[in-house]
Amino acid sequence: MTLFSLLQSSPALLLSVCFVLGLFVGSFLNVVVYRLPLMMQTTWRRECKEFLQQDSQETTQETATESAGENSGTDQTPQPFNLMVPRSACPSCNSMITAWQNIPVISWLILRGKCGNCKHPISIEYPLVELLTAILSLAVAYKFGASIQLIFALLFTWSLVSLALIDFHTTLLPDSITLPLLWLGLLISLVPVFVSAPDAIVGAAAGYMILWIVFQTFKLITGKEGMGFGDFKLLAALGAWLGWAKLPLVILLSSLTGAIIGIMMMVLFKHQRSQAIPFGPYLAIAGWIALMWGDQIVAMYTGQMGL
């Protein structure tokens, strides 16, 4: 019996595997959310300095210092800094995190939310992201079962989690995630996995154009930029995965969610109206809901409208 057959015959095992897998993926996503924006900023600074032809020694020193943020030595040689190296360390005492301390959720509970060396508090966001990713992975496994759809739905879910968190913290939606997500959505439509190729192509084009038109209209009226180009690309990616027919649902859900949370932030946290609120997290939430229950929501709405 193959592993796939075993998972098909045992739903409980499938759910357990996906939950545990989600915990470890969530742990990796914490690294992505923290490091990817730093990697992007380092690249931008290096490219700008090269363009301006600044002194190469100054460029090397500043890039190494600003990118890693963890190295306090005087060596001017830039140290490797990516999603794999250097090893994760405490931002307070710079002590390396051991293997067992990387165990999702459990290690945070054992350490009582503090560094094992200096006792500096560890943000509760880390275990919450791990739990969120695990719960979403569990829901996806319950929805799709042991199928090809499950594999791609998990990739879709994990990508949206990382994009939502990065945009929430930095107001950035990295092309290194959104563009592969877009192309993968178009590629799997050839099978098709979720929607047909024509639906995916039209969905991607329409997703980009809808927000581009909104952006240009808002800018024409107010003279300000209401959103970033990353939002266009993310909605295009959602259109490629979900098809053009679910775009109205995604836009409606994301707008409602954004409006409700925005009002709550202004009332409860005195959030200034002029202060930018990232739209990516709401698109990600709406896109995931549309993947999971979009057909049922649309059917319920059209049924109530008598269509």
Residue ranges, per PLM feature:
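Multi-pass membrane catalytic core of lipid/isoprenoid biosynthesis enzymes
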Residues: 87, 94-153, 230-232, 236-237, ...
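Interhelical loop and helix-boundary elements at the membrane-water interface
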Residues: 36, 80, 103, 117-126, ...
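Membrane-proximal soluble regions of multi-pass membrane proteins
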Residues: 35-125
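Functional transmembrane core segments of multi-pass inner-membrane proteins
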Residues: 5, 18, 149-257, 300-307
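Structural signal for the C-terminal ends of transmembrane alpha-helices
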Residues: 142, 164-168, 189-192, 268-269, ...
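Hydrophobic transmembrane alpha-helices of multi-pass small-molecule transporters
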Residues: 134, 138, 189, 259-266
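Alpha-helical transmembrane segments
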Residues: 5-35, 39, 213-225, 235-307
